[in-house]
C-alpha cells in the first residue's frame, strides 16, 4: 500500500528542496513561492482540505454539477440542499431552465465564495438557427462571429428576470465549430464576461448576417475555475453518494463528488500566513508583515489575493496593500486587507496580545496609567507617550489628543451659569408645564370610546394633510418639467 503523503509545510531555516508540483489545490508549486521567512511555530489545529472530517468536508465543499435541462437553477440547488441535508446552498450564476452544463453548487461555508464565482468568466457552446441561407456560407458566418468580440451593447431578452436596461458586456473570444448552410444551423464556442446573454448574441448575429437568427440550444462548458472536464457530476451521482453513506457508511463516493472550496481559488495569487496570525485574520484583522511567510510573484497593489495557511486551507479573500517588490523589501506595514473571510473563527487558537508592547499596555491599564480603552491619561509615563504609536487612531496619536483635552478642561475654570440664563430657562419650563396641564384638562373624563374616536380623527387629519402635501409636490414637479 502506498504511503500517504502529509501535505503540510514545516518550519525550516533554508529554502525547501521538496518538489511540490504534485501537491493538491493551493499547495501546488509551493516551493516556487517567494520566501519572506521560513521560521514559524506550527499550531496543531485545522487540517489539510482533503483530510477534513466528513462533516467539515461537506460543509466547506463545492460540487461541479451538470445541470439537467428543464428545472431552473434555483430548483436544482434546493434539491441539492435537501439531498445533502445542508443548512445553506448557493450557485455560481443562474442558467435558464432549458440550458444545461456547468453549475457550481456551494455548500454552507463555501457559499461565501458565491459572489466571487458569479462574477467570474464563463464559456458556452451554442447551437444557432439562422432563418435563411447566407450567400457567403461558412466564411461569412465566421467573419460575423469575429466582428462580435470585445465590448458589446446588450439588452436582456424579452423574457428575463432582470430589468431590461442597456448594458455593456465583453466577449473575450469565439470559435466556429461547425456550420451547415443547407440546414441553417451553426455551432460555436464563446468565452465571455459574467452576465452576457448568448440569446441576445444570436439575435445580433442574425441581424449582422441580414437573415435573422435565434438560439436553438446552449450548454455552459466552464464557470470560473471549473470546467466540464474537471470532475463534473450529475444529480444522480450526488443522490447515490448520499445513499451509499447513509446505508453502508462508505464516504469515498461523497468525497469524490464534493470538492473542497479551495478548488475554486486556484486561479488567485497566494499569500501564506503564519499559524499564529490565522485567527486574527478570521476576526477581520489586516495581515501585517510579521504574519507573512510566503507570497506569489507578480502581486499588484489592490489585486485580489487568497490568504492561506501552511496546511493549504483558504482563510480569506483579501485585497493586496503592497506589491511583490514591497513585500520582499518592507520590514513593517499592512500586507492585505480582508475582503471576504472564509474560515470559521476560533478554528485556530487566539495568539494576539502576547507581544512585548501588548503585555506592557496591559500592565499599564491594570495599574491605572492608561484608561480602560488603552488611551493615555495624566498618570501615563512620558516614555510610553513618546514611543507608542496607535495605528487605530485616525489622525495622529489619539492618546496624546485625549491627554491634551483633559489638561485643557482642568486648566480652564468652569464658568457658573448667569442669573439671567437661569431665569429665562425657568420661564420656558413653566410655559411648557402650563401647555401640558391645559391639554390634560381638555381630555379629562372622556370614555375609552371617545378617546379612540379622537385618535382616529387625528390620524385621518394627518393622512389628509400628507396626501395634500404629496399632491402639491407632484404638481410642482410636473410644472418644472
UniProtKB/Swiss-Prot annotation:
The protein's name in its UniProt record: H/ACA ribonucleoprotein complex subunit CBF5
Molecular functions (GO terms): DNA binding; pseudouridine synthase activity; pseudouridylate synthase activity; RNA binding; snRNA pseudouridine synthase activity
GO terms (BP aspect): anisotropic cell growth; box H/ACA sno(s)RNA 3'-end processing; conidium formation; endocytosis; establishment of cell polarity; mRNA pseudouridine synthesis; rRNA pseudouridine synthesis; snRNA pseudouridine synthesis
UniProt-annotated stretches for the region Disordered: 387-481
Reaction(s) the record says it catalyses: uridine in 5S rRNA = pseudouridine in 5S rRNA; uridine in snRNA = pseudouridine in snRNA; a uridine in mRNA = a pseudouridine in mRNA
NCBIfam families for the chain: CBF5, PRK04270.1, unchar_dom_2
Pfam families assigned: DKCLD (PF08068), PUA (PF01472), TruB_C_2 (PF16198), TruB_N (PF01509)
Physiological role: Catalytic subunit of H/ACA small nucleolar ribonucleoprotein (H/ACA snoRNP) complex, which catalyzes pseudouridylation of rRNA. This involves the isomerization of uridine such that the ribose is subsequently attached to C5, instead of the normal N1. Pseudouridine ('psi') residues may serve to stabilize the conformation of rRNAs and play a central role in ribosomal RNA processing. The H/ACA snoRNP complex also mediates pseudouridylation of other types of RNAs. Catalyzes pseudouridylation at position 93 in U2 snRNA.
Biased composition (Basic residues): 454-471
The keyword Metal-binding is annotated on this UniProt entry: no
Similarity comment: Belongs to the pseudouridine synthase TruB family.
The keyword Nucleus is assigned to this record: yes
Cross-referenced InterPro entries: Dyskerin-like (IPR012960), PsdUridine_synth_cat_dom_sf (IPR020103), PsdUridine_synth_N (IPR002501), PUA (IPR002478), PUA-like_sf (IPR015947), PUA_sf (IPR036974), tRNA_PsdUridine_synth_B_fam (IPR004802), TruB_C (IPR032819)
Keywords: DNA-binding, Isomerase, Microtubule, Nucleus, Repeat, Ribonucleoprotein, Ribosome biogenesis, RNA-binding, rRNA processing
Residue span, PUA domain: 268-343
Active-site residues annotated for this sequence: 96
GO CC terms in record: box H/ACA snoRNP complex; microtubule
Biased segments, Basic and acidic residues type: 406-428, 443-453
Highest taxon of the lineage: Eukaryota
Documented EC number(s): 5.4.99.-
Compartment(s): Nucleus, Nucleolus
PANTHER family named in the record: CENTROMERE/MICROTUBULE BINDING PROTEIN CBF5, H_ACA RIBONUCLEOPROTEIN COMPLEX SUBUNIT DKC1
Subunit architecture: Component of the small nucleolar ribonucleoprotein particles containing H/ACA-type snoRNAs (H/ACA snoRNPs).
Amino acid at each position: 500500500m502506498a504511503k500517504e503523503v502529509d501535505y503540510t509545510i514545516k518550519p525550516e531555516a533554508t529554502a525547501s528542496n521538496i518538489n511540490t508540483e504534485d501537491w493538491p489545490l493551493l499547495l501546488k508549486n509551493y516551493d516556487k513561492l517567494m520566501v519572506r521567512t521560513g521560521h514559524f511555530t506550527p499550531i496543531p489545529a485545522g487540517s489539510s482540505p482533503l483530510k477534513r472530517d466528513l462533516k467539515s468536508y461537506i460543509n466547506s465543499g463545492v460540487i461541479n454539477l451538470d445541470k439537467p435541462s428543464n428545472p431552473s437553477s434555483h430548483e436544482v440547488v434546493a434539491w441539492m440542499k435537501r439531498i445533502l441535508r445542508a443548512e445553506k446552498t448557493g450557485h455560481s450564476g443562474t442558467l435558464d431552465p432549458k440550458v444545461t452544463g456547468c453549475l457550481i453548487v456551494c455548500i454552507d461555508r463555501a457559499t461565501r465564495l458565491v459572489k466571487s464565482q458569479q462574477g467570474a468568466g464563463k464559456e458556452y457552446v451554442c447551437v444557432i438557427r439562422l432563418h435563411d441561407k447566407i450567400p457567403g456560407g461558412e466564411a461569412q458566418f465566421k467573419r460575423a462571429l469575429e466582428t462580435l468580440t470585445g465590448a458589446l451593447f446588450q439588452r436582456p431578452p424579452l423574457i428575463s428576470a432582470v430589468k431590461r436596461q442597456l448594458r455593456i458586456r465583453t466577449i473575450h473570444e469565439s470559435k466556429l465549430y461547425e456550420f451547415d448552410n443547407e440546414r441553417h444551423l451553426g455551432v460555436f464556442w464563446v468565452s465571455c464576461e459574467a452576465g452576457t446573454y448568448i440569446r441576445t448574441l444570436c439575435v445580433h448575429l442574425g441581424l449582422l448576417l441580414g437573415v435573422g437568427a435565434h438560439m436553438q440550444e446552449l450548454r455552459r462548458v466552464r464557470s470560473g475555475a471549473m470546467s466540464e472536464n474537471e470532475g463534473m457530476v450529475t444529480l444522480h451521482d450526488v443522490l447515490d453518494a448520499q445513499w451509499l453513506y447513509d446505508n453502508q457508511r462508505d464516504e469515498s463516493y461523497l468525497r469524490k463528488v464534493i470538492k473542497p472550496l479551495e478548488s475554486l481559488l486556484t486561479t488567485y495569487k497566494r499569500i501564506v500566513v503564519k499559524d499564529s496570525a490565522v485567527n486574527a485574520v478570521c476576526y477581520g484583522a489586516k495581515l501585517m508583515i510579521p504574519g507573512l511567510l510566503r507570497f506569489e510573484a507578480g502581486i499588484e497593489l489592490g489585486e485580489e489575493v487568497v490568504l492561506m495557511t501552511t496546511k493549504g486551507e483558504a482563510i480569506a479573500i483579501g485585497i493586496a496593500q503592497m506589491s511583490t517588490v514591497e513585500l520582499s523589501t518592507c520590514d513593517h506595514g499592512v500586507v492585505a486587507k480582508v475582503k471576504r473571510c472564509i474560515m470559521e473563527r476560533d478554528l485556530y487558537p487566539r495568539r494576539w496580545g502576547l507581544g512585548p508592547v501588548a503585555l506592557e499596555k496591559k500592565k499599564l491599564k491594570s495599574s491605572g496609567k492608561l484608561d480602560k480603552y488603552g488611551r493615555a491619561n495624566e498618570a501615563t509615563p512620558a516614555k510610553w507617550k513618546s514611543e507608542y504609536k496607535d495605528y487605530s487612531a485616525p489622525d495622529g496619536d489619539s492618546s496624546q489628543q485625549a491627554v491634551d483635552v483633559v489638561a485643557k478642561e482642568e486648566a480652564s475654570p468652569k464658568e457658573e451659569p448667569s442669573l439671567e440664563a437661569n431665569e429665562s430657562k425657568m420661564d420656558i419650563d413653566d410655559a411648557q408645564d402650563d401647555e401640558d396641564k391645559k391639554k390634560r384638562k381638555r381630555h379629562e373624563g372622556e370614555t375609552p370610546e371617545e378617546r379612540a374616536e379622537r385618535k382616529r380623527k387625528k390620524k385621518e387629519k394627518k393622512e389628509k394633510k400628507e396626501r395634500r402635501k404629496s399632491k402639491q409636490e407632484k404638481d410642482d414637479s410636473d410644472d418644472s418639467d
